[in-house]
Amino acid sequence: MATMIETPYEDLLRRVLEEGAPKGDRTGTGTLSLFGAQLRYNLAESFPLLTTKKVYFHGVIGELLWFLRGDSNVKWLQENKVRIWNEWADEDGELGPVYGVQWRSWPTPDGQHIDQIQVALDTLKNNPDSRRNLVSAWNVSELDKMALMPCHLLFQLYVADGKLSMQVYQRSADMFLGVPFNLASYAALTHMFAQQAGLEVGELIWTGGDCHIYNDHIEQVKEQLSRQPREYPQLKLHKAESLFDYDFDDFEVIGYDPHPTIKAQVSV
């Protein structure tokens, strides 16, 4: 008897398509929108890289490594053939104090900076039961300086029985283009934190606020939902010297057999 493949993302995508309320949005494209949803993935069993369409994993890892560099310029991304941030960059490639800057160099009132990622890792090692182990990109005082305000703005780390779980809050969730990318990114980050802290992986829990499908993605969504899901792959993570020393070659996806890519326009 065939094993039932769980499809939390596809189930939510179908819900938004069938139950979403028509809404306007910042980009002028228009959406179907549903407010408040949660997806759960057991990272010990598999890696949540969607199979109902091919997800650009090189781009997922490139962006994540770029965040962990604390970078605000697209130059490093472009050098590594990742162009997903080009639309928002200015003529010099700058984006302002976006995700990576807040993660690695959150400014304090006295002129110092906090490396939230290092603090989070230290907390995992020294106080794993802490309920205060969060990383935020939502710096209210700097939002207006950012080319794009954070969509996935907060994550919390949780340890039980030697397993690390992560919960992510995403205020604005582009269900077709953005969320598949974000799921894989935070799943990879959970593996990295766990490996560096000497823990096993637990769950990735994704919580979405405004979960939406853009009007010009509806046909693509219908095509994706018509496809039969396949087994999720596994992630083999080669250990780096530190959380900040991982490179593209350290991430090996095993058994990834997705349906073909489905093209769609990004709403800027």
From Swiss-Prot:
Gene Ontology biological process terms, A to Z: dTMP biosynthetic process; dTTP biosynthetic process; methylation
Keyword Isomerase in record: no
GO terms, molecular function: thymidylate synthase activity
Main location: cytoplasm
PROSITE patterns documented for this protein: THYMIDYLATE_SYNTHASE
Ranges that cross the membrane: none
Domain of life the protein comes from: Bacteria
SUPFAM superfamilies linked: Thymidylate synthase/dCMP hydroxymethylase
CDD domains for the chain: TS_Pyrimidine_HMase (cd00351)
Residues annotated as binding (6R)-5,10-methylene-5,6,7,8-tetrahydrofolate: 174, 267
Listed EC numbers: 2.1.1.45
Top-level EC class as recorded in UniProt: transferase
InterPro entries: Thymidate_synth/dCMP_Mease, Thymidate_synth/dCMP_Mease_dom, Thymidate_synth/dCMP_Mease_sf, Thymidylate_synthase, Thymidylate_synthase_AS
Quaternary structure and interacting proteins, as annotated: Homodimer.
Name of the molecule in the record: Thymidylate synthase
Species per Swiss-Prot/TrEMBL record: Corynebacterium aurimucosum (strain ATCC 700975 / DSM 44827 / CIP 107346 / CN-1)
Record gene name: thyA
